[in-house]
């Protein structure tokens, strides 16, 4: 373990966190998310944080009282795309130079391109990114919809039926379909069996809410994987976690039918009254589909890059 001291904050770098340190990061993330209305770390980062075998670099700043005041997670598993960065500062310790210190320590630690997510698109994050030479490269929108509003019931294409995902049986066929459906997606299309297994092991996993569209020959043609977010002190909310359609099945209304089926599941089987999803701003076809189904923009998540 070694330390650097940019600005007024002492930044410590390590390649491994012990369980109490991980708990401190999760506490910081919860405080930042409650203050900002958007969690600072995405699912990928949280999964890697809890995996003792996942390679990563961790930058931390502790206040004089020992509280974790700032944290940055560096993911170098995709060198072609650049090192992925997510960072957060505890609300109590903001406006003390900690965010800038972490960002500069990231730059001092990493050689090569950097890509950083700012969840919630807060003005302070945008200003810091621009000041440090990052450019706005990609935007994900979070859309939301009340489940109390009527849900359309579009028909499935002829011969197509829906059934639940079967863990251990459907894994390979689903991974192949996912790769086809997201061939141009920077993250989703590269999922491996380990990625699927990690999510199957999460407490929120619900095979009954992982809907598969199957043609008469038994081939998978599409899927709608739903998720329920449960957070103490906050109302539950459903998510269109991943929705995909085989390119050969495009244009037949399967995407709309799958979306509606998942929404009905979240409302009728899980008792939820609202749902959210994430969609790339550039995916105009998907945005249009979701808007027709009653979704509206809620927040933005911005990817910044620096060469």
From Swiss-Prot:
Q: Which Gene3D superfamilies match?
A: 3.40.630.30
Entry binding sites for 1D-myo-inositol 2-(L-cysteinylamino)-2-deoxy-alpha-D-glucopyranoside: 43, 187, 227, 239, 278
Could you list this entry's UniProt keywords, alphabetically sorted: Acyltransferase, Repeat, Transferase
EC number per UniProt: 2.3.1.189
What InterPro entries is this protein classified in? Acyl_CoA_acyltransferase, Bact_Acetyltransf, GNAT_dom, Mycothiol_AcTrfase
* Reaction(s) catalysed by this chain's protein: 1D-myo-inositol 2-(L-cysteinylamino)-2-deoxy-alpha-D-glucopyranoside + acetyl-CoA = mycothiol + CoA + H(+)
Note the Pfam families from the entry: Acetyltransf_1
| Annotated residues for binding of acetyl-CoA 1 | 87-89
Please cite one Gene Ontology biological process associated with this protein.
mycothiol biosynthetic process
Q: Which residues bind acetyl-CoA 2?
A: 243-245, 250-256
* One MF annotation (Gene Ontology) recorded for this entry: mycothiol synthase activity
The segment(s) forming the N-acetyltransferase domain are 12-152, 160-307
- Top-rank taxon, per record: Bacteria
User: What family does the entry list?
Assistant: Belongs to the acetyltransferase family. MshD subfamily.
Q: What HAMAP family does the record tag this protein with? A: MshD
Q: What does this protein do?
A: Catalyzes the transfer of acetyl from acetyl-CoA to desacetylmycothiol (Cys-GlcN-Ins) to form mycothiol.
Quaternary structure?
Monomer.
Q: What is this protein called?
A: Mycothiol acetyltransferase
Species of provenance: Salinispora arenicola (strain CNS-205)
Q: What is the lineage of its organism?
A: Bacteria, Bacillati, Actinomycetota, Actinomycetes, Micromonosporales
Gene field:
mshD
């Amino acid at each position: 373990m070694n330390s650097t001291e940019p600005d007024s904050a002492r930044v410590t770098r390590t390649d491994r966190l012990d369980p109490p340190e991980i708990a401190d990061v999760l506490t910081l993330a919860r405080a930042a998310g409650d203050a900002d209305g958007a969690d600072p770390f995405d699912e990928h980062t949280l999964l890697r944080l809890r995996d003792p075998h996942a390679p990563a670099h961790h930058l931390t700043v502790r206040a004089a009282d020992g509280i974790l005041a700032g944290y940055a997670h560096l993911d170098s598993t995709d060198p072609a795309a650049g090192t992925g960065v997510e960072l957060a500062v505890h609300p109590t310790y903001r406006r003390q130079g900690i965010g800038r210190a972490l960002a500069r320590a990231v730059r001092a630690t990493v050689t090569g391109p950097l890509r950083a997510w700012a969840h919630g698109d807060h003005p302070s994050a945008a200003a810091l990114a621009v000041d440090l030479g990052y450019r706005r490269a990609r935007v994900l929108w979070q859309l939301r919809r009340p489940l109390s509003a009527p849900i359309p019931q579009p028909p499935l294409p002829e011969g197509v039926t829906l059934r639940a995902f079967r863990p251990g049986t459907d894994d390979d066929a689903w991974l192949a379909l996912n790769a086809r459906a997201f061939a141009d997606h920077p993250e989703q299309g590269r999922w491996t069996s380990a990625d699927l297994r990690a999510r199957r092991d999460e407490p929120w996993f619900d095979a009954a809410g992982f809907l598969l569209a199957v043609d008469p020959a038994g081939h998978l043609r599409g899927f709608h994987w739903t998720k329920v977010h449960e957070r103490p002190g906050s109302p539950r909310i459903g998510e269109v976690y991943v929705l995909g359609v085989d390119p050969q099945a495009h244009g037949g209304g399967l995407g709309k039918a799958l979306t509606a089926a998942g929404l009905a599941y979240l409302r009728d089987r899980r008792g939820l009254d609202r749902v959210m999803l994430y969609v790339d701003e550039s995916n105009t076809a998907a945005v249009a589909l979701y808007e027709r189904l009653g979704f509206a923009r809620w927040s933005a998540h911005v990817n910044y890059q620096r060469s």
